[in-house]
Amino acid sequence: MGKLKSVVFDALPEHETCWSLTTAPNGKIYIGVCGELTGGLSVFLVQYDPETETTEYLLDVGEALGRSARSGATPISKVHYGMIPGHDGKLYCATHFSGPPVTDVVWRPWQTWDDPVRMACGLCLFTYDT
């Protein structure tokens, strides 16, 4: 029988979902730690090393893409299923919007579509060099 190991993301206490998980050629596991229920949270790219059992918080994706989760706009809150390790050592990722702006309690996309401040900017594709 296999061993069950829980990894807790202590540095992200308000983030509550993970929609993306992959193992890269370097043997490390990469996770998109998402914030969908609390307004104004950005997705984080986190690395877990199963050999050393250490966690490293690599990237606030929204900040890295110039879209601060605290700006009042719909935040980049999720890496949604799209996290592909390439043979070139890069992760190829796709973002998604599913968390409310910092000013909202609940995500209601139809209330932000025509708001020039709160609207989502569209999906983003990005790479991360592992």
Kindly label every feature range from the protein language model.
Residues D49-T52, Y128-T130:
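Short loop/turn segments that connect beta-strands within beta-propeller blades
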